[in-house]
Curated annotation (Swiss-Prot):
K(+) binds at residue 44. Homotetramer; dimer of dimers. It catalyses: L-methionine + ATP + H2O = S-adenosyl-L-methionine + phosphate + diphosphate. Pathway: Amino-acid biosynthesis; S-adenosyl-L-methionine biosynthesis; S-adenosyl-L-methionine from L-methionine: step 1/1. It comes from Streptococcus sanguinis (strain SK36). ATP binds at residues 16, 175-177, 242-243, 251, 257-258, 274, 278. GO terms for cellular component: cytoplasm. CDD domains: S-AdoMet_synt. This is S-adenosylmethionine synthase. Binds 2 divalent ions per subunit. Binds 1 potassium ion per subunit. Its cofactor is Mg(2+); K(+). GO terms for biological process: one-carbon metabolic process; S-adenosylmethionine biosynthetic process. NCBIfam families: metK (TIGR01034). The gene is metK. Residues 100-110 are annotated as: Flexible loop.
Length: 396
């Protein structure tokens, strides 16, 4: 009998407390960048019943009405009813933002490579905003070159939000979670979905029977291709039996607590740094996007079926301290050759990444729910496949 393996990933909806926090942080970032593209922002958010606290560091010439940004974001998510215990118009908003530390700013604004050097490359000016390691990943399991479990998990909660906002399922409330277990064959190819878990907040008068029916017919079967579902696929819909109290009324939320949901669902490694609320000088964010961009173009070029890219930086230094590529035995060329090609084609200094991916724009709020990678519903620069031909040529 051939060996088969299971792998599970989860996602959460835009109404999950941690995702509310992420979206508020990124909405503030976008509001600042729309006025001051060179701003340095590190905005953190905490949410709980009736309250939002925004704190962190911002260096900018922009004026942003934090109170309004917070309330507008909460309303867009769908928390507009006081019965939810968290409502856009009644929530207390408590901002506490200060200027970025000058000790950090001096390394970001003038990288080690240019200090005392009159003949400087302008792209050497920006040093990494912190030390750290970042990963990017791609695999040929889906058209968007993402692992199937996280791809399906995101699509399930996004479908729930669509049905809620359109009014097609009127009893749905904003908070929800999904989890998908995929069975892989001996060649690491996905063959079927073994288990689907969906927990969705609902009005108190909704019955378990109608929730179960609607979620299976209008969500699961609408999202998961029929080829992956069979009579052995298990469905767990609101397995606690009731999910009326949710969102920040049921659980507090913080920016940066869903980093695995934001990336590859645990299928690839993660350096530990969160994304939301951070401008692109923070390599936690920008280098993770660059690493995904590299990995996706490698797989799209047919140079590997699976690729993981690690980048690492020292604070205040422009050039990465390391670049590593792992193709897990699926590569068509040596990994050392791929690394040389990547160094040649991709400028991995923070300023180079910002220029390459045009990251000074206010594009981040849209990434703060349903994943930063593999998005097919929005146009993100790190998802482009414009380096495929250059990579093919470089490894000849």
């Amino acid at each position: 009998m051939s060996e088969r393996k299971l792998f599970t990933s989860e996602s959460v909806s835009e109404g999950h407390p941690d995702k509310i926090a992420d979206q508020i942080s990124d909405a503030i970032l976008d509001a600042v960048l729309s006025q001051d593209p060179d701003a340095h922002v590190a905005a953190e958010t905490a949410v709980y019943t009736g309250s939002v606290h925004v704190f962190g560091e911002i260096s900018t010439t922009a004026y942003v009405d934090i109170n309004r940004v917070v309330r507008d974001t909460i309303a867009e998510i769908g928390y507009t009813n006081t019965e939810y215990g968290f409502s856009a118009e009644t929530v207390g908003v408590h901002p506490s933002l200060v200027e970025q530390s000058p000790d950090i700013a001096q390394g970001v604004n003038e990288a080690l490579e240019v200090r005392g050097n009159a003949d400087q490359d302008p792209l050497d000016l920006i040093g990494a905003g912190d030390q750290g390691l970042m990963f990017g990943f791609a695999v040929d399991e889906t058209p968007e070159l993402m692992p199937l479990p996280i791809s399906l998990s995101h699509k399930l909660v996004r479908r729930l939000a669509e049905l809620r906002k359109s009014g097609e399922i009127a009893y749905l409330r904003p908070d929800a979670k999904s989890q998908v277990t995929v069975e892989y064959d001996e060649n690491d190819q996905p063959v079927r979905v073994d288990t689907v878990v969906i927990s969705t907040q609902h009005d108190p008068d909704a019955t378990n029977e109608e929730i179960h029916r609607d979620v299976i017919e209008k969500v699961i079967k609408a999202v998961i291709p029929a080829q992956y579902l069979d009579d052995k696929t298990k469905f767990f819909i609101n397995p606690t039996g009731r999910f009326v109290i949710g969102g920040p009324q049921g659980d507090s939320g913080l920016t940066g607590r869903k980093i695995i949901v934001d990336t590859y669902g645990g299928y690839a490694r993660h350096g530990g740094g969160a994304f939301s609320g951070k401008d692109a000088t923070k390599v936690d964010r920008s280098a993770s996007y660059a690493a995904r961009y590299i990995a996706k173009n490698i797989v799209a070029a047919g140079l590997a079926k699976k690729a993981e890219v690690q980048l690492a930086y020292a604070i205040g230094v422009a050039q990465p301290v390391s670049v590593r590529i792992d193709t897990f035995g699926t590569g068509t060329v040596a990994e050392s050759k791929l690394q040389e090609a990547v160094r040649q084609i991709f400028d991995l200094r923070p300023a180079g990444i910002i220029q390459m991916l045009d990251l000074k724009r206010p594009i981040y709020r849209q990434t703060a729910a349903y994943g930063h990678m593999g998005r097919t519903d929005i146009d993100l620069p790190w998802e482009k496949l414009d380096k495929v031909e250059a990579l093919k040529a470089a490894v000849q």
